[in-house]
Structure formats: C-alpha cells, structure tokens
Amino acid sequence: MDRKETIKIKVGDKFIGGDSPITVQSMTNTDTRDVEKTVEQIKKLEEVDCDIIRCAVPDDEACQALGKITKKIAIPLVADIHFDYRLAIKAIDNGISALRINPGNIGNEEKVNLVSKKAKEKGIPIRIGVNSGSLEKDILNKYGGVCSDALVESALRHVEILNKVDFHDIVISIKSSNVNQMIESYKKISSKVNYPLHLGVTEAGTPWRGIIKSSVGIGTLLSQGIGDTIRVSLTGDPIEEIKAGKEILRALNLYSKGVEFISCPTCGRTEINLIKIAKEVEKRLDGFDKNIKVAIMGCVVNGPGEARDADIGIAGGKGYGLIFKKGEVVRKLKEEDLVEGLIEEIKNI
C-alpha cells in the first residue's frame, strides 16, 4: 500500500514519518518518581521491541526522575505533560527525546510559545496530543460538543501557534474512544497537513476489547496509507500494547520481524487437540527472532495444502500429525510429540 508522505521527525535515535518504518510506542504505568520500577518496566518493553516510550510527568519530582531514567534506558523517552508548561521546559533539560503536550490544558499561547522555543533550542520534537476529553471551551461551544471537526480545529490551532515561532518538528495525534470519530478525524487532518501522525484509540479498554477497537481504528487508517507511529492503549500490561501493535502492522505487511503464527479454527475433521497444541506452540515461539511463518492446521485439507506458503507447520491426523516445510512433509509424529518435534525443526531452520 502507498503511505502518505510526511515530514521526517527525529525522536532520539528513531525517526517518525517520511520513509521511516512505522514505530510502535507504549506508556509506562509505573510511578515515574520511582526510578527503579520505571526503568525495570522500560527494559522489559525494550525486550519486545518497543520503539519509543512515554512517561507521565505530574510534578517536579517526576521531572527530576526523568534525568535518571533516560541514562539507564536505550529507547527514546517522551515526557507527557499536562497543565504546567514549566514541567515541559524542565523535562527538556532532563534528557528527554520528545514532548507530548495537550494544548487544550497546557496554558495560553504565550506559555506554549515558551515551551516551543526551548524545544527548538534543544532539538526536541513536540507531539500535539489532542483528545476528545480535553478540547478548548470555545471550540466545544462552536461545534456544540466533541466531533471530528472540533478535534481537527484544535490540532490546527496549535500547529499554527508552533509555526508562528518557526517550530516545525511536530507530530500530531487526534484521539477519541469513538473509533469512527477517530478515523474521521485522522483522515481530515491528514488531508490538511504533512506532519507525521501518531495513531491511537484513547481509553480503548481492557486487552480483549481494547485490542479489537485499536485494530479497527489503527488498521483502517494504516490500510489507507495514513499514520507514522502507533500506540495501542490498553488497561493492562504495556507489553501487551507492543505485541498488539506489532501484530497490527504484521497483518498489513508493515512489519516482518519475528514469527508470523497462523492456525486454523478447527472443525469436525480435526482429530487432534489442536487448540492445546496451537496455544503451546504460540507460547514457545514468543520471542523467537526468526523471520518465518508457522502454521498449525487441524487436518490435511488446511495443511499443508492451504498453508503451503508457510515456512513450516503441522497438519493433524488421527492421533498423529505431519510436520511440513514449504508444503512438503518432512516428519510424521505422535500427537504428544508434535510440539517438541516442531520446535526442534524450527530451531534448525
């Protein structure tokens, strides 16, 4: 698919926009003031290939902690600032790679200007983070409530404020918990600016519901070439946000690192415990760095026939299974030996 060409923005050692790969972000849910726990969580996120991490900065103590945190992690850190513009200025002096501010609650234009001047001086990009819960009162009154036009107008207003002081290292997000509103808002802003867009559905929910809403919203936009970086917001472990984000990209052929795992839904032809086998194989493959496609199929109808494009897989029989590579059968094993046999073959690829 063709991606819309946007300005390339540098965030630490990563790039957002232009011809850069789409990055996947998350946000810590630790107390930022607790340096040890925050660093521990970020390092776990690094292990699952989190590209950029964001931390909440509610006060001066959290702001000071950023300086210690950034020295102990390998990925760029974005400071998330609300209400107090002075925290944004202090965060820049504490080694962050980017700022996320919500213009609707950071203060008047003069305060935003002070932040942008400091950011420009230090080469720090700013994400304008507009969301449905914090629009300016005059915009809400103009439109009679939250709508896509209101969200877009808020974003454009703050782009203009930054542009007035010749600041252009901008990333934009327009988030809503309403998926249709989110999609409509991003499509509108994409038609008006060429700044990179950070996609996400805010307050998406717990993992099961949140992943569905995020997949629909983020996936729809990405499939239309809109979006340069993503976050799957979940009420849960941030690691699941990264895994979900990578799989959304993988589903659209925008990410190929690691194992692509597929399995059939089972039917009356299945004569092995495929559900158990599939779950175990998927768990065992977590973290494998081989760029391969693995298929777990219940019968010879689906595998190796329909899964012929897989690098390796299982096709179930009655109490046994076939291991195949590129559509060719290489081993026949009892059901209880299939998982170990498959993992052994994968390690030898």
From Swiss-Prot:
Among Gene3D superfamilies, the record links this protein to:
Dihydropteroate synthase-like, Sulfite Reductase Hemoprotein, domain 1
* Pfam families associated with the record: GcpE
Q: Which keywords does this Swiss-Prot/TrEMBL entry list? A: 4Fe-4S, Iron, Iron-sulfur, Isoprene biosynthesis, Metal-binding, Oxidoreductase
State whether keyword Transferase applies.
no
Q: Which residues bind [4Fe-4S] cluster?
A: 264, 267, 299, 306
UniProt-listed InterPro entries: Dihydropteroate_synth-like_sf (IPR011005), IspG_bac (IPR016425), IspG_bac-typ (IPR004588), NO2/SO3_Rdtase_4Fe4S_sf (IPR045854)
Describe cofactor binding as the record notes it.
Binds 1 [4Fe-4S] cluster.
Cofactor requirements of the protein: [4Fe-4S] cluster
Which GO MF terms does the UniProt record name? 4 iron, 4 sulfur cluster binding; 4-hydroxy-3-methylbut-2-en-1-yl diphosphate synthase activity (ferredoxin); 4-hydroxy-3-methylbut-2-enyl-diphosphate synthase activity (flavodoxin); iron ion binding
Q: Top EC class per UniProt?
A: oxidoreductase
Protein EC: 1.17.7.3
What's its catalytic activity? (2E)-4-hydroxy-3-methylbut-2-enyl diphosphate + oxidized [flavodoxin] + H2O + 2 H(+) = 2-C-methyl-D-erythritol 2,4-cyclic diphosphate + reduced [flavodoxin]
Q: Which GO terms describe its biological process?
A: isopentenyl diphosphate biosynthetic process, methylerythritol 4-phosphate pathway; terpenoid biosynthetic process
> Which pathway does it serve?
Isoprenoid biosynthesis; isopentenyl diphosphate biosynthesis via DXP pathway; isopentenyl diphosphate from 1-deoxy-D-xylulose 5-phosphate: step 5/6
Query: What PANTHER family does this protein's entry cite?
Result: 4-HYDROXY-3-METHYLBUT-2-EN-1-YL DIPHOSPHATE SYNTHASE (PTHR30454), 4-HYDROXY-3-METHYLBUT-2-EN-1-YL DIPHOSPHATE SYNTHASE (FERREDOXIN), CHLOROPLASTIC (PTHR30454:SF0)
What the record says about family reads: Belongs to the IspG family.
The UniProt function text for this chain reads: Converts 2C-methyl-D-erythritol 2,4-cyclodiphosphate (ME-2,4cPP) into 1-hydroxy-2-methyl-2-(E)-butenyl 4-diphosphate.
Q: Which HAMAP family match?
A: IspG (MF_00159)
Please report the name of this protein according to its UniProt entry. 4-hydroxy-3-methylbut-2-en-1-yl diphosphate synthase (flavodoxin)
The gene it comes from is: ispG
